[in-house]
Structures are given as C-alpha cells and as structure tokens.
C-alpha cells in the first residue's frame, strides 16, 4: 500500500465495477483521508465468450489475473463476486472480508412470460450455469436450455433480440445495476437453489498486509461470513468449482444455521439434495458433513460424470 492510497483490482464489467465502487465508497467513508483507486483488468473468463463456461474448464476464470496483480504488488485488494471465487487461494493470498449479502436468489427474466411455469413446451431458456440448468431441466424437461454468455447487459440484449424466450440471471446483479424492473419472478431457493456465495461480495488481499487487513475489517459482515463459510466448506469437500452443478444456501434463523445443498446431473435426470442444521460456530463442519452425505447418496457419481475423471476422494 502506497502512503494513503489503496488500489483495488477489479474486472471491467459494469457489475464488477459497481462492486469495486461499493467497496471504495465504504472504505473512504470508514477511513477519512484514505484515497482508493480502481485498477480495472481483463480476466480469462471475460475473454472466452464463445464457449460455455463449463467447457472452458479450470477454476478461477474470473479471478486469476486479479490475484497475479496482488502478488506483483500492482494492487492491494481484489474485489470479487463470491460465487466466482475458488475454494483455494495462491500462497500468500486469502479472503479476509465478506460484505453484507444482497438478495441471493435467481431471477426469471422474460419479455413475454410471467414465470417459469408459464413457458410453453419447447421454449428456449438461456443460462451459462450448470447449476441453473440442472434445476430447470428437472422441473421443466420440455424446455430447451441454451448457453448464454456475456455481461448482464449483453445477456438482456440477446433476450430482447428474440434469441431466447426467457433467461435466468442473479437478482443481486440486476438490483445493483438498477435493472430490478426486468425481474419477472425472484425464484425462491425451493425452486432454484443459489450458487455458493451468490449475492455476496468478497475481498482478497495479501495475508501479510496487516495495514490493509485492518482497513478492511469494518466492512466484514459477520452473519454473511458465517453463511458463506458453511456453503464454501461444503463446496470445497465436493471439490466443486464455480462451473459445476452444485447449489448451496445457508440461512441463520433464530440463532440456528440451516444449510441446504444439491448436486445434479446437467440434464436434470438425477438430483441429490440434503440439508443440515447446527450452530453458527460449527459452520465449516456443517458444510463438510452435508457434503459427505451428498457424496454418499449419489453425488460422487454425478460429479465424476461432469468432470469426466476421478470423483472426489
């Protein structure tokens, strides 16, 4: 960190820049005299737009370049959408702050139809997510699900051009970009379980940078951090990346942590679901035990097919 200047590594998409600006404003409000600068950059996931994410392969498609900037001291922190953050970090880096979660649900977006159930047989639905795909296919096997890549504006443009009858996007992203009016239905977790960490913004930095960590401390939201910890522990045990058919959602209700999760075959033909309840301080163990239950109930074979290789140990 240079004098009183803190540099944020961020992707260049409108949503990523919103998240970085949000963190910048929060930091400057908490620390008088601190100047925060954005360092926009392009990631591999931003460049490869003609291939479904699940086929691009690899973890950290949207974060690796930002992490290199941290390691090379070209930036002090990196701001991420938590659903894009791998469960493992390069040596010397770590996730130190998780901001308060926005609405984690998925949004049904259509210009012609009011809900998923209103779609006629054979309707074309766009999504880049195997998690969304498997849940849609299970509920509506009569739909045609096609890949949809690009930033939020690009995806909405393809819907408006008639390429799709409906698309599925994150409620949080639409709200942050002032596009809440495009949401026809916010899909409850019972209908479409969110991605791990969906709706939360995470901040990564060098673990030995005590000054920066102290500056970030006021931005951490304890309840969100506990919920996301449970979801990510489950995902780590499953060895899941952000492009696999895994959904997970934790809630804190009356002091009890309730974790739900699923693993599904992309075509919706198989779905393994489970849930656990426990104490907030046991978030990590709750996630691990639920993952083990899923693996033993059929998730191991589903994930092996998805990875076309070895199932999780």
Curated annotation (Swiss-Prot):
S-(dipyrrolylmethanemethyl)cysteine modification, residue list: 242
Stored SUPFAM superfamilies: Periplasmic binding protein-like II (SSF53850), Porphobilinogen deaminase (hydroxymethylbilane synthase), C-terminal domain (SSF54782)
Gene3D superfamilies per UniProt: Periplasmic binding protein-like II, Porphobilinogen deaminase, C-terminal domain
Biological processes, Gene Ontology terms: protoporphyrinogen IX biosynthetic process
GO molecular function, one term: hydroxymethylbilane synthase activity
Superkingdom in the source lineage: Bacteria
Any single GO CC term annotated in Swiss-Prot or TrEMBL for this entry: cytoplasm
Alphabetical keyword list: Porphyrin biosynthesis, Transferase
EC number per UniProt: 2.5.1.61
Transmembrane segment boundaries: none
Cofactors that this protein relies on: dipyrromethane
Catalytic activity, as annotated: 4 porphobilinogen + H2O = hydroxymethylbilane + 4 NH4(+)
PROSITE patterns recorded: PORPHOBILINOGEN_DEAM
Note: The porphobilinogen subunits are added to the dipyrromethane group.
Subunit record text: Monomer.
Family recorded in the similarity comment: Belongs to the HMBS family.
Function, as annotated: Tetrapolymerization of the monopyrrole PBG into the hydroxymethylbilane pre-uroporphyrinogen in several discrete steps.
Name recorded for this polypeptide: Porphobilinogen deaminase
Native source organism of the sequence: Enterobacter sp. (strain 638)
């Amino acid at each position: 960190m240079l004098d009183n200047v803190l540099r944020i590594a961020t992707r260049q998409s409108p949503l990523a820049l919103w998240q970085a600006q949000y963190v910048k404003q929060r930091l400057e409000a908490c620390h008088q005299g601190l100047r925060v600068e954005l360092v926009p950059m392009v990631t591999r996931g931003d460049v490869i737009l003609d291939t479904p994410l699940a086929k691009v392969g690899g973890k950290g498609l949207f974060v690796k370049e930002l992490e290199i900037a941290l390691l090379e001291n070209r930036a002090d922190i990196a701001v991420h959408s938590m659903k894009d953050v791998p469960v493992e970090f390069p040596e010397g880096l770590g996730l130190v702050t998780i901001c308060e979660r926005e609405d984690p649900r998925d949004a049904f977006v259509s210009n012609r139809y009011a809900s998923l159930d209103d779609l006629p047989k054979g309707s074309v639905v766009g999504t880049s997510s195997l998690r969304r795909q498997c849940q849609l296919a299970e509920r509506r096997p009569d739909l045609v699900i096609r890949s949809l890549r690009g930033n939020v504006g690009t995806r909405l443009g393809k819907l408006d051009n008639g390429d799709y009858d409906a698309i599925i996007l994150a409620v949080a992203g639409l709200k942050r970009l002032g596009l809440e009016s495009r949401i026809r239905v916010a899909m409850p977790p019972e209908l479409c379980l969110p991605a791990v960490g969906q709706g939360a913004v995470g901040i990564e930095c060098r673990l030995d940078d005590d000054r920066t960590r102290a500056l970030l401390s006021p931005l951490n939201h304890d309840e969100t951090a506990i919920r996301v910890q449970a979801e990510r522990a489950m995902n780590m045990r499953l060895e899941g990346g952000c492009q696999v058919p895994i959904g997970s959602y934790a809630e804190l209700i009356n002091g009890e942590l309730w974790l739900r999760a699923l693993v599904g075959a992309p075509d919706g033909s198989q779905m393994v679901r489970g849930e656990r309840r426990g104490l907030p301080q046991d978030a990590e163990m709750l996630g691990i035990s639920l993952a083990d239950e899923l693996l033993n109930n059929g998730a191991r074979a589903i994930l092996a097919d998805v990875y076309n290789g070895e199932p999780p140990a």
